[in-house]
Each structure stands twice: as structure tokens, then as C-alpha cells.
Design a protein with these regions (language model features):
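Well-ordered beta-strand positions in beta-sheet-rich domains
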Residues: 31, 66-68, 82, 158, ...
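Ligand-binding loop in jelly-roll beta-barrel domains
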Residues: 79-104, 197-200, 206-228
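Conserved hydrophobic/aromatic beta-strand scaffold that supports enzyme active sites
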Residues: 29-31, 49, 74-76, 156-158, ...
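A short, N-terminal "cap"/entry segment at the start of jelly-roll beta-barrel domains
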Residues: 1-30, 101-153
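Conserved short histidine dyad/triad with adjacent acidic residue
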Residues: 13-18, 25-44, 140-146, 152-172, ...
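Short acidic-glycine-tyrosine-enriched beta hairpin
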Residues: 63-80, 190-207
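Short, conserved beta-strand element in jelly-roll/cupin
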Residues: 43-59, 170-186
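Short hydrophobic/aromatic-rich beta-strand segments that constitute the beta-sheet cores
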Residues: 59, 95, 168, 186-188, ...
Length: 228
């Protein structure tokens, strides 16, 4: 798999798979299979985005509270959160981690807890700073922000958009996309062209040639890591 191009994530992979890693920017993205297990309560050393494909698990906070997640659900564990994990069934999930030794946890990380994403959460229209990228009509974009780390480099949100087409350009970030509604074609305008629909996932690395074309309203979760 080309580490510098648009990637389709395959939910049917039968074993753990590392899709992408860049240690300089602290980026790790992959698919993980775990058997029934438990992990002791301890302080997390990185920010992590998780989307469950099969099975279920519980995140246990240091006060004993449990947050339960099952297939199709998505959450964020912020760096510094004191928590453990319990699961009674085999579980498969996509993940994206931000491992930056210089970043500090939020002071209120225990109040933040495990952050649950919900496709029915309220979205707000956002300003598009540069509309020159669009070919044809300028769309409206909407967002619900869930989490940003203390460096401002790790960002998780739900993002919705009207149909639009943008010209090919080098991608300015690392992004894992979980599509919730609608469809889109992502391409490099040369060798790669991939159609994505609801419940599918893509990863786009920094500097990859990237073109977007959608013909219907679309909603996705994103986990972004900005390069240094």
C-alpha cells in the first residue's frame, strides 16, 4: 500500500493491520483485533480515536463508571485520562493515535472523560476561509467539534457538507474519515479514484494528492493530526 496516497480501510481484514505510521508527527493509524480481556486502570499516554467495527467494549474510569460501546460507535480517549478497558467478546476497531511526548493532557481531563461521538449531535455552519479551491458552486459546511488536544494538532469532529468538487492539491494534514451519510469520490486525478459510501472509511496522509467530488449531502467523522 502506498503510504503517500489515499487509502481505503478494509473492515474485513482478518488480523491486525498498521495502515500508516509517521513517528516524527506522532501519527499511527490501523485496525486492531482484541480477544475478550481486561486492561488495568492507568493513565493513558496518548490521544486515541476509536471506531468499533465488530464486538463491544467498556471503558472503565477511575471512579468506577463504565462507558459501553458497541459496533458502529465511535469515541475518543484523551491523553492523561485514568481509565481501563473491559470486554467479554472479540472486538475489532479502527484507531488513530497521536503520540507526542511534548504534548500535555488537559487540566480537566478526568472531567472530559471518554468522549462519545453521536451522528445526531447538533452541527453549526462554519466559515470557509478559502473558496478558491472549489470548482462550481460553493457549498455550505457544518461541524460539531468533539475534542482538540492541548497542542491544537489532534482534532476530532463531525463534519457535514453540501455537494461540491475541489481541484486536486497536496493534502495539508493526516486524516481518518468515517463516512456516516452520503457518498464521495476521492482521487489523485491520475492513478487513484475511490468511491466511498456511508459506513466506509478512508485515510489520507499528509501531502497526498487529493481531489474531492461529491454529488449529495455528506456527513463524516474525522480525526485529524496536523503536521509539525
Amino acid at each position: 500500500m502506498n503510504a503517500h496516497s489515499i487509502m481505503r480501510l478494509d473492515p474485513h481484514v482478518a488480523e491486525d493491520k498498521l495502515y500508516f505510521e509517521n513517528k516524527v508527527d506522532g501519527v499511527i493509524a490501523g485496525l486492531c483485533h482484541t480477544d475478550a480481556c481486561s486492561a488495568e486502570v492507568q493513565k493513558t499516554s496518548y490521544d486515541e480515536f476509536v471506531h468499533i467495527l465488530e464486538g463491544s467494549l467498556s471503558i472503565v474510569l477511575n471512579n468506577g463508571h463504565k462507558e459501553n460501546f458497541s459496533a458502529g460507535q465511535t469515541f475518543v480517549i484523551p491523553k492523561g485520562l485514568i481509565c481501563g478497558r473491559e470486554q467479554s467478546v472479540n472486538t475489532k476497531f479502527y484507531y488513530m493515535r497521536f503520540e507526542d511526548e511534548t504534548s500535555q493532557p488537559h487540566d480537566n481531563v478526568q472531567d472530559l472523560g471518554v468522549i462519545r461521538l453521536n451522528p445526531s449531535d447538533t452541527i453549526t455552519e462554519i466559515t470557509i476561509p478559502d473558496t478558491s479551491q472549489f470548482q462550481g458552486l460553493i457549498p455550505k459546511h457544518y461541524k460539531h467539534s468533539y475534542y482538540t488536544d492541548t497542542t491544537g494538532r489532534f482534532l476530532v469532529a463531525m463534519w457535514n457538507s453540501d455537494p461540491f468538487e475541489r481541484e486536486v492539491a497536496p493534502f495539508n494534514r493526516y486524516e481518518l474519515m468515517i463516512f456516516l451519510k452520503g457518498s464521495v469520490t476521492l482521487s489523485d486525478n491520475h492513478n487513484i479514484s475511490e468511491d466511498f459510501n456511508a459506513h466506509e472509511a478512508a485515510f489520507v496522509p499528509y501531502k497526498a494528492p487529493y481531489k474531492w467530488k461529491s454529488e449529495e449531502y455528506l456527513s463524516k467523522y474525522y480525526c485529524i493530526i496536523m503536521p509539525k
